[in-house]
């Protein structure tokens, strides 16, 4: 009876041991499998993380490069803006210079027109006075033996003859012109007359040219008889 119980107990012990070893063996295999799975998961995660980090680095590099490009563009835009402002200032200065030059040209044109009008008026007056001189000369040519010639420098040369009875063709002459003040100016008198300056001043005051010619002829005649 006791032997049977011992045999049964021994059998139970053996069954428990075998079952325990089987359970431990299965658990060990499961642990090894889990460990390998864990390693693979960690490796895959590390690879994914590495790829992600590299992508992040590229993104950072791209961002920095883009930021640098923006800085360069902003600098270039600022330089162009400064150049444009400088150009605008130069254009304004040139415009002011052109306006001043245009105004100056207009003033010169107006001054030229005034001077031209003054010269034209003076020339007309000069022509009228020369016409009067010529008319007076023509009137007295026969009576005074007077010949008038136009010579260099817009001068008129007055030549008297029939003064010296011994030499009727002997010339007595002087030259006449209008100076810048449009006054009579006598020169080149031959023979020389001391009173010529007085006659010149008188004709300037009276504008009586006929009397001037008569006085000059009388003065030449006085030289012959004195």
Swiss-Prot record:
Q: Which family does it belong to?
A: Belongs to the SPC25 family.
Identify the GO cellular component terms for this protein: cytosol; kinetochore; Ndc80 complex; nucleus
Name it.
Answer: Kinetochore protein Spc25
Principal location:
nucleus
Q: Which Gene Ontology BP terms does the record give?
A: attachment of spindle microtubules to kinetochore; cell division; chromosome segregation; mitotic spindle organization
Region labeled Interaction with the C-terminus of SPBC24 — which residues?
Answer: 147-226
Q: The organism's lineage?
A: Eukaryota, Metazoa, Chordata, Craniata, Vertebrata
| Positions of post-translational Phosphoserine modification | 12
| The protein's role, per its UniProt record | Acts as a component of the essential kinetochore-associated NDC80 complex, which is required for chromosome segregation and spindle checkpoint activity. Required for kinetochore integrity and the organization of stable microtubule binding sites in the outer plate of the kinetochore. The NDC80 complex synergistically enhances the affinity of the SKA1 complex for microtubules and may allow the NDC80 complex to track depolymerizing microtubules.
- Cell location: Nucleus; Chromosome, Centromere, Kinetochore
- Provide the species name: Bos taurus (Bovine)
Q: Where is region (Interaction with the N-terminus of SPBC24) located? A: 1-146
* Subunit and interaction comment: Component of the NDC80 complex, which consists of NDC80/HEC1, CDCA1, SPBC24 and SPBC25. The NDC80 complex is formed by two subcomplexes composed of NDC80/HEC1-CDCA1 and SPBC24-SPBC25. Each subcomplex is formed by parallel interactions through the coiled-coil domains of individual subunits. Formation of a tetrameric complex is mediated by interactions between the C-terminal regions of both subunits of the NDC80/HEC1-CDCA1 subcomplex and the N-terminal regions of both subunits of the SPBC24-SPBC25 complex.
Query: Which sequence ranges form a coiled-coil region, renumbered to this chain?
Result: 72-147
Organism domain of life: Eukaryota
Enumerate the CDD domains for this protein: RWD_Spc25 (cd23784)
**Which keywords appear in this protein's UniProt record, sorted alphabetically?**
Cell cycle, Cell division, Centromere, Chromosome, Coiled coil, Kinetochore, Mitosis, Nucleus, Phosphoprotein
Question: Where in this protein does the record put region Interaction with the NDC80-NUF2 subcomplex?
Answer: 1-58
């Amino acid at each position: 009876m006791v032997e049977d119980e011992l045999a049964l107990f021994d059998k139970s012990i053996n069954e428990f041991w075998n079952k325990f070893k089987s359970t431990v063996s299965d658990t060990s295999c499961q642990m090894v499998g889990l460990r390998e799975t864990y390693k693979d998961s960690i490796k895959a995660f590390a690879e994914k993380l590495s790829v992600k980090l590299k992508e992040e680095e590229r993104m950072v590099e791209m961002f920095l490069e883009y930021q640098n490009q923006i800085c360069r563009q902003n600098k270039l835009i600022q330089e162009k803006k400064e150049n444009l402002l400088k150009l605008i200032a130069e254009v304004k200065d040139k415009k002011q210079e052109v306006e001043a030059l245009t105004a100056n040209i207009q003033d010169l044109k107006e001054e030229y027109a005034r001077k031209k009008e003054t010269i034209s008026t003076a020339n007309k007056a000069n022509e009228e006075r020369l016409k009067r001189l010529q008319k007076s000369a023509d009137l007295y040519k026969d009576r005074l033996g007077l010949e008038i010639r136009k010579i260099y420098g817009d001068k008129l040369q007055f030549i008297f003859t029939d003064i010296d009875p011994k030499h009727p063709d002997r010339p007595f002459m002087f030259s006449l012109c209008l100076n810048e003040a449009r006054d009579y100016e006598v020169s080149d008198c031959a023979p020389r007359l001391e009173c010529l300056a007085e006659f010149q001043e008188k004709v300037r005051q009276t504008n009586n040219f006929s009397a001037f010619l008569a006085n000059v002829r009388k003065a030449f005649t006085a030289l012959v008889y004195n």
